Amino acid sequence: MSTNLEVGIVGLPNVGKSTLFNAITKAGAEAANYPFCTIEPNVGVVDVPDKRLDVLSDMFKSKKIVPAAMRFVDIAGLVKGESKGEGLGNKFLSHIREVDAVAEVVRCFEDGNITHVEGSIDPLRDIDIINTELCLADMETVEKRQERLVKLAKTGDKKVKLEQAVMEKVMAGLSDGVPARRLGLTEEEQEFLGELHLLTMKPVLYITNVAEGEVADPSGNEHVQAVKKYAAEENAEVIVVSAKMESEVAELPEEEAKEYLEMAGLEETGLDRLIKAGFKLLGLMTFLTAGEMESRAWTIKLNTKAPQAAGKIHTDFERGFIRAEIVSFDDLVACGSKAAAREKGLVRLEGKDYVMQDGDVVEFRFNV
């Protein structure tokens, strides 16, 4: 995974996807009321909000702050028959293969002025259409691999036999419209799929787009409740946003935006909730480095060991890793300075087997 986490935003036409994306990146992608106005994916890079960086920057008198980043890719509106080239075809599907996770925007608001491509509001049907298209595209990928395996099987390699069995299992699921991630595959089975970059193996989060008044309390919105129930079956994340409201907030100065959110009964923007959900979905966390030059956040997978975390900064750090000098952010703040934390014995030296924790403030020692 690159340093920047990449999330592809997909949805049927006119569900509020581009409006939401514009709000996310203030990128001004053409949010228009007709299908296919975004064929080339628009990419927006946003900072991952982290108040700890401000605290570290003050403490270490850092010249700059470098937050972690998340890339959002607005992938063109999808329609039925996509994988057969009826809508935007394979161009759309190749864009989505490159992302770490997929965020599906589904419409859960009524508005007579905005047409729905399927004629009525039904988010579960919309999810089903998207899943069907992604399953069909994956079937083509698996089929090509199966053809290749037939040739390889002639060598009598046992591993090929195992892989063939996995492909059959996945193909059967996809044929029934079951995404590969819902097939309960073992880790060993998943390894065979690694290089195929199957679309339906990617973790998914659902963004339910509601009317402005329902964001703080969507309990009365039956569409949202239906999506939540569906998502629970695959441990997927669901976030509730109003794309219209997000685009309004995005235009405001920070203080006014805060007041606007408070009036709506919200503590944070939909974007912040989306980023948190993305982190949770992909099992990510943050460690921090701080000094006079900069205070910076680094994104790693949960359970990453110290040398691999060091490698995020520079490959030399991993190669020549000696030790990591670590203090937890909370301990550091409680003590007021690194020197005070050291006096209290809260600054630790950790070796190559240390598993990083969220909020570790680190200085790596290495020798190349």
Q: What is each of the regions a protein language model found here?
A:
Residues G44-P49, A76-E86, R97-K159, G173-T186, ...:
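Conserved Switch II/interswitch segment of TRAFAC-class P-loop GTPases
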Residues E98, Q357-D358:
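Short, flexible surface segments
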Residues F36, D50-L53, V66-F72, E86-D100, ...:
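Amphipathic alpha-helical transducer elements in NTP-driven molecular machines
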Residues A27-P35, N42-G44, R52-V55, K84, ...:
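Glycine-rich, flexible loop/turn motifs
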Residues F36, P41-G44, K51-L53, D58-I65, ...:
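Short capping/connector residues at structural and topological boundaries
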Residues M1-T115, E143-K144:
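Conserved G1/Walker A P-loop phosphate-binding module
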Residues M1-V10, V15, F21, R148-V355, ...:
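C-terminal-of-GTPase-core extension/linker across diverse P-loop GTPases
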